[in-house]
Every structure is written in C-alpha cells, then in structure tokens.
C-alpha cells in the first residue's frame, strides 16, 4: 500500500525480484516533508516497517528499527536511510535471548530495538532523538509530552518506546476498561503507558514545526492482534482507541484551519473473519416461554 506494488508475503518494500522500492514517505521526505510513524503495537512491526523501511522479511525487527531510526542496517549497510522524524510505539520490555526470525546481526535483549542502537539515537549521547521511554511510577502521557515539548523546542526528533506484555499498548476493552480476559494489567501498566491518541498528539506537536508539511502514519495495530486472537472485546476496544486517535487528528486539522492543505486517509490493510463457536452467548440469557 505504501509503495504501490504487489510482492510476496512478508516483504517490506522489496519487490518479487528482491529489489528495493521506495515508499511514499521517503519520496515526501526528499521533498522536505517531516515523517512520523505511530503504532499501538511494536515499533518495527509490519505496518510501521512498510511505512519506511526495506527488508526481505517483516520478521527482521531490529534491522527494520535501524532503518526507521536512520542507522546502518542489513538492507542499507553503507548508506543508511535518513530515518523518520517521529517514531512512537510499543515493544518495551519484550526481551528475547534468541529470535530465529531475525538475521545474524540480531542482538539478544529487546526483540525490536538493540540496546546499543537505543543508546546511539539518544540526543544525550549525541544522537538525533529525544527519547521517551516507559518509566516506573511516572505517567506515560507526561513522559511522552515532556519529550515532545523538548523535541519541538530544540528542533530534534522524537522517539517514544512504551508497551506492556505482548509487545503492544494495554488493551482497552469495549466498555473502556482495561479488563481483557486474555491478559491482566497492573496499575503500573495503565499509568506508565500513553494511549494511541496521546501518541498522536505528541507526533502532531513535533511534526507541525516543519514549515514544509508532514506525512504521518498512525496505526491502531492492536485491532488486528485482537482479531487474530478471536477476541471481540479487545478488538472493539482497540477500534475505539483508533477512533480516539482519528479524532485527535481531525481536531488538530480543525484547530489549525488546515483542511485546504490536508489529506486524511482511513483504511485497513486487510480484514478478518471471526469464528463464533457459541453465538448464542451474544444474545444473553434466553427467556423461558410463557405457557400460561
């Protein structure tokens, strides 16, 4: 969708002949646009990856993160990509000692971002990104907004890394609570993570400083993950979270009177079937017939 070609399953902006193709975000970046990628799931999962990176397999998470963050990767060994201006998502705490789906340069630790890469991008170490990461006892929203303000003030890029178990933001269920049947979230999980809408707000705040305009991809990726799990409650809640993010975008456009210069596209990259093995439960308890 981002590069306008058909290719084999699992490819990230690589065509059927193994050649790199350029997604629209990189074309716009060459024209001076700011580029942002935001997701409720892992920072280098399929949709964030396809927004910007090149790789022969979507499973090569650490190398895809390198493309997104402007570091040397297996796909760009000698001339790394410029990197996106804003990258916000999950994957924090998702550690692994090995990952057979990734390449030989996989580093044990976080599956999606190697520790040395995380250190290298930080402005505190001479990198290009103000870093916001999940912190014990601190509001994730506050941590992210503080970093976004700093990035906006100093003209830096913004990287935000959050998440709970499973490599995504905590699921809000259909009733707006965090009471998923598949997972149990602690109070810390809820406090220390921003919502997708709050991530969207932070991204808009940083990217809007670019006078040339910007391209921003926002993914409610946990809708897909919940549907894969056949969990209607989580899927509905995740859809609502995506709707909140969409409203954040349209409110921003309204406040800035920017509809003449803005295109907002809402789409899905694929659909799902649900398997209802007990459809009668959706109707609730049945009433006994009145035989009088």
Predicted feature locations:
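Active-site nucleophile/metal-coordination loop of metallo-enzymes that catalyze phosphate/sulfate
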Residues: 1-65, 74
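A post-motif C-terminal structural segment
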Residues: 44-292
